[in-house]
Amino acid sequence: MNKKIFSIGLAVMLGAGYSLTAFSQVKPETLVKQRQAAMVLQGKYWGPLGGMAQGKVPYDAAVVARNAGFLETLSKMPWDGFVPSTKDVKSAALLAVITDAAKFKEAQDRLQSEVSKLVAVSKGGDEAAVKAQLVATGKTCGGCHENFREKK
């Protein structure tokens, strides 16, 4: 059931994203909401995995595989919402997402690469390897948060 709901929601979000062919016609606030929604969903599916990596939550291979699959898609979604027209919209994103776009893109690519590795490792069933990859993936999240997001 969750997979069906997620698939429908993802299809709606992707459809909305693809229908917005010219960013200049899209309200900057809409782009910010889109990227924030993708980040919230990443947090939802990352939370249990982070808990497993830290030993706070019992390891569950099925949850790892499912959530890693969701994260593989979600890790690609927010980036087209970080455009110059959004710089004046209140959000936690620092101006560096625009002014240092190359470094920001590198961080995005690292995240996507590590999430893809997590998906592959999760299929192998080796708990130690999965936990090691969870740590590596988590570090890529921190790389963006440290350099491109306001400190909380």
Question: Which role fits each region the language model picked out?
Answer:
Residues 17-21:
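N-terminal signal peptide c-region/cleavage motif recognized by signal peptidases
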